[in-house]
Amino acid sequence: MSVSFENKETNRGVLTFTISQDQIKPELDRVFKSVKKSLNVPGFRKGHLPRPIFDKKFGEESLYQDVMNALLPNAYEAAVKEAGLEVVAQPKIDVTSMEKGQDWVIAAEVVTKPEVKLGDYKNLEVSVDVEKEVTDADVEERIERERNNLAELVIKEAAAENGDTVVIDFVGSIDGVEFDGGKGENFSLGLGSGQFIPGFEDQLVGHSAGETVDVIVTFPEDYQAEDLAGKEAKFVTTIHEVKAKEVPALDDELAKDIDEEVETLADLKEKYRKELAAAKEEAYKDAVEGAAIDTAVENAEIVELPEEMIHEEVHRSVNEFLGNLQRQGINPDMYFQITGTTQEDLHNQYQAEAESRTKTNLVIEAVAKAEGFDASEEEIQKEVEQLAADYNMEVAQVQSLLSADMLKHDITIKKAVELITSTATVK
């Protein structure tokens, strides 16, 4: 194989390489044997057409495209490796010569990984805005949240307040004319919940069961029903019941209702304190890691980030997101329907963060390379087993999906992240 690379501009060039006749000839024979099985040529049994007759009737050149499709991927990969390139996007392939009996010549326009000039990435000083300590207020807030989840609604005689639930009938009209979707009966509405358009719930505060209230509101300009958007409406609203939330007493019985594994309120508080401490410690570690990596990226210089890398990152992120949905049993089309979004919206969402993520990935890879990190067979096997456990898959299935090179890359990246993070100190 003949290989050459010509730089055209920063991070771009043309990789020219050949596919030899030693590779082409056996592949021509293989493709011919496959093609002739389906050929019907008068005077010959199906599948028994001699090669010279085929070449005379159809031309050897008619096989070239299939041969090229079979040989090109490995030839390109070998050329990239021989040229010592790190290619970061799909190439633009141009077959410059495909003559009979001659080596074929291919020119590939490639985008190469940009140069990363590392700054300081070890022993960094970082600031984080995450508290590690668990306070009594944290524990009480957690218990109060669970306590409210066990609250019951009880009828009250007094006037409705924010936080109460009212059971109502309502009939809406605009200029005295009722409109579709503006009527409801025995509807339970939490005051202050924001379920209804702005101003509706506020006008029921201070009223009691048995009262009828004329609620005057204006539909927002961006309201989903365009025929109602921006218009003033009157809702004749009858309050049937006012209900207040009644929370259970804060005692040992509540603790057992919240968590059957505890006997007392003190036990529950201690359990929550430990859980919150573990969660805060994890959040603190994540914050330190994020701050340290961000600082390492800021300290580095990347020579002209190719736009193709950003596109590749967006594509990868979208595919990863959609793959996670499917692993959870969620159909992507159903997700877009429920959320009222499109795949284009998803692309735009990831586009905003793709440049930052691409820079981060490049810097971490550069750190791994600078430190000479590698992965042993034992580490690769351990990574496979961990992935199999995480995704409830067979080890063999993980191995079939991920190459050893991909696993090695992931392990070295983890080592680089660990180095940057473990040597950082918090101001």
Swiss-Prot record:
Location within or outside the cell: Cytoplasm
Gene Ontology MF, one: ribosome binding
Cytoplasm as UniProt keyword: yes
GO BP annotation list: 'de novo' cotranslational protein folding; cell division; chaperone-mediated protein folding; protein transport; protein unfolding
SUPFAM superfamilies the record matches: FKBP-like (SSF54534), Triger factor/SurA peptide-binding domain-like (SSF109998), Trigger factor ribosome-binding domain (SSF102735)
Record-annotated PPIase FKBP-type domain positions: 163-248
Catalytic reaction(s) noted: [protein]-peptidylproline (omega=180) = [protein]-peptidylproline (omega=0)
Coiled coil: none
Alphabetical UniProt keywords: Cell cycle, Cell division, Chaperone, Cytoplasm, Isomerase, Rotamase
Known role: Involved in protein export. Acts as a chaperone by maintaining the newly synthesized protein in an open conformation. Functions as a peptidyl-prolyl cis-trans isomerase.
Family according to the record: Belongs to the FKBP-type PPIase family. Tig subfamily.
Comment block on domains: Consists of 3 domains; the N-terminus binds the ribosome, the middle domain has PPIase activity, while the C-terminus has intrinsic chaperone activity on its own.
Protein name: Trigger factor
